[in-house]
């Protein structure tokens, strides 16, 4: 770590930048796999590079946060800001996501339990296969689910701030006052959906690796992930 400081004991920002440039590509590749093919890797790299520059410029070691942790927050935050500014999620996808969440909420209230895929599909008036495709189409928009939550419930619920960006919407919720409510909601999910969230967000397995654990394909994992997040939003939205 000494190579990151000048002879005067001042942090060498250029050396810090050079050492952590590979982190930008790592985070960009991790994010790209969750996005439509239309999102270019170069755009993510450029935004992430700006995030790293901001991290280098604003990092204060005296605050006690490791630079890697701080840099990852800045890099990911910059990439997500870039995606939000482009509003890449089609309106039809957002509409479908809302309709699925609404159907789930209505059924859960009526049944007193988690609704099955067949029940949700019937409520929407579509075949199960079409419902599963809808889950696939809407899964990518889950990156911004916490933004939609904030819009629905107001700024009094601080899920995301510039200084405290986290890596995913689930972690955003777990860092706030909603932690216990989120944990209770997760525990009420179907077992396979709980497992998907645990493997994806805590163990950081990718879709292919989770598929191997569950003995299903990547598309099925994506569907389960999408369905789990929608259930969480529905459960939390009632409270």
Swiss-Prot record:
A motif (Interaction with polymerase core subunit RpoC) lies at residues 43-46. Residues 96-166 are annotated as: Sigma-70 factor domain-3. Residues 16-88 are annotated as: Sigma-70 factor domain-2. GO terms for cellular component: cytoplasm. GO terms for biological process: DNA-templated transcription initiation; regulation of DNA-templated transcription. Its main location: cytoplasm. InterPro entries: RNA_pol_sigma-70_dom (IPR014284), RNA_pol_sigma70 (IPR000943), RNA_pol_sigma70_r2 (IPR007627), RNA_pol_sigma70_r3 (IPR007624), RNA_pol_sigma70_r4 (IPR007630), RNA_pol_sigma_FliA_WhiG (IPR012845), RNA_pol_sigma_r2 (IPR013325), RNA_pol_sigma_r3/r4-like (IPR013324). Residues 207-226 bind DNA. Keywords: Cytoplasm, DNA-binding, Sigma factor, Transcription, Transcription regulation, Virulence. Gene3D superfamilies: 1.10.1740.10, 1.20.140.160. HAMAP family: Sigma70_FliA. Belongs to the sigma-70 factor family. FliA subfamily. Sigma factors are initiation factors that promote the attachment of RNA polymerase to specific initiation sites and are then released. This sigma factor controls the expression of flagella-related genes. May regulate the expression of genes involved in virulence. This is RNA polymerase sigma factor FliA. The gene is fliA.
């Amino acid at each position: 770590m000494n190579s990151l400081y000048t002879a005067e004991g001042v942090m060498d920002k250029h050396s810090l930048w050079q050492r952590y440039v590979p982190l930008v590509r790592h985070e960009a590749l991790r994010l790209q796999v969750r996005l439509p093919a239309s999102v270019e890797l170069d755009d993510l790299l450029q935004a992430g590079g700006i995030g790293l520059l901001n991290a280098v410029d604003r990092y204060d070691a005296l605050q006690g946060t490791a630079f890697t942790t701080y840099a990852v927050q800045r890099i990911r935050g910059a990439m997500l800001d870039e995606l939000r500014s482009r509003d890449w999620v089609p309106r039809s996808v957002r509409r479908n996501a809302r309709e699925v969440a609404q159907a789930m909420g209505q059924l859960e209230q009526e049944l007193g339990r988690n609704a099955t895929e067949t029940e949700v599909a019937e409520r929407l008036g579509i075949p199960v296969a079409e419902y599963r495709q809808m889950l696939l189409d809407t899964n990518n928009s889950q990156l911004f689910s916490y933004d939609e939550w904030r819009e629905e419930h107001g700024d009094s619920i601080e899920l995301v701030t510039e200084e405290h960006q986290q890596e995913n919407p689930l972690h955003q919720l777990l860092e706030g006052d909603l932690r216990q409510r989120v944990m209770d909601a997760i525990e009420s999910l179907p077992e396979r959906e709980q497992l998907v969230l645990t493997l994806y967000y805590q163990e950081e397995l990718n879709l292919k690796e989770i598929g191997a654990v569950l003995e299903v394909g990547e598309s099925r994992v994506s569907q389960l992930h999408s369905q789990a997040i929608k259930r969480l939003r529905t459960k939390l939205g009632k409270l």
